[in-house]
Amino acid sequence: MGSIYLDHAAATPLRPEVAAAMTESTRVAFANPSSQHAAGRLAKRLLEDARERILDLVGGRTAGTARDRLIFTSGATEANRTAMLGLAAKGCRIAVSPRDHPSIQSAAAELAARGHAVRTLPLETDGTISRPALADDIEEAGEHGLLLAVTPICGQTGLRDVEMNLPEGRVTIHADVTQAAAWDALSYADSSWTSMTLAPHKFGGPRGIGALVVREDVPITPLLPGSQELGLRGGTEAVPLAVGFARALELATQERQEVSTRVQSLRDRLEVGLVEAARDAGLQATIIGRNAPRAPHISAVSFPGIDRQSLVMAADLEGACLATGTACASGSSEPSPILFALRLDDSIIHSTFRVSLGRTTSDEDIAQAIEILRGVLSRHVH
């Protein structure tokens, strides 16, 4: 039996169609897209076609005088840091939450070291940002303004948060839609977001590339100065990665409704099976946010009394790939901050692990995962 991969929130398999598009672009457009000769112009055309296609698929403005900008980066982490550090005006307040990716949290810490007032907003029990606390922060920011980070789908729990109606001109919003891009129909032009981050390795695309979308008229200080990417990100662009990015997003968009429906059904079946397996072992099972709005592909599961790291390691030895948390924080032995922010019992917090499904997850994968975890629980108890 091969491995059962249930860590799609960390990374997804590269789609064959995407690999084919990247291979072809490598063959025909190998030149530097900044070069002025014919080969360079061909590479530049493929790069710009990919940029415009991605921008169109996320609902950005691609025509007229107010075209939105899409900056290719090395990944979502760089894009998040560019947004947070580059959009923070002098004297502005910074607001983040336990929902946010570690790259946003670390950027906020850096801004605090530079003298900005930074607040970690509390969450409601459904995982959404506390609106009263946010209103207080906006009021305290006054004329200096507030830079707010939002994460529509939390990568640890799958819990959703909805877009907020905030005072125009007083709040700059950076949205990290890295988890949401494959599962939600995005309309950047109609949103209140100033900037937005996404990366294709979450939906069958390549690693090593991400994108930051920014409004046309918003000043932003580059993290890596240079002449490329509208002067907002230095370094020779990776044309094949951009082509793969666009193709992966195109496929994910076309298949979104069908895949979301099927994956949610599989996730629900998995959760029922894990609750039954826990009961058979004489344990309780908790599904974090089970009755709250959630993304279809993520389940945060807790078996109080069972160490999450031991469980994930035991499952791995049996052939099931799970996670204790977000891959970008996997070096830490501490539970995810959102679990503390939800004010859960310590026994739940320290036993929570993540199962995340994707387009390639099958009925057989779910059945086998349930049986593997049933065996792991039985051995841990007895």
Q: Which functions belong to the PLM regions below?
A:
Residues 1-382:
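Pyridoxal 5′-phosphate
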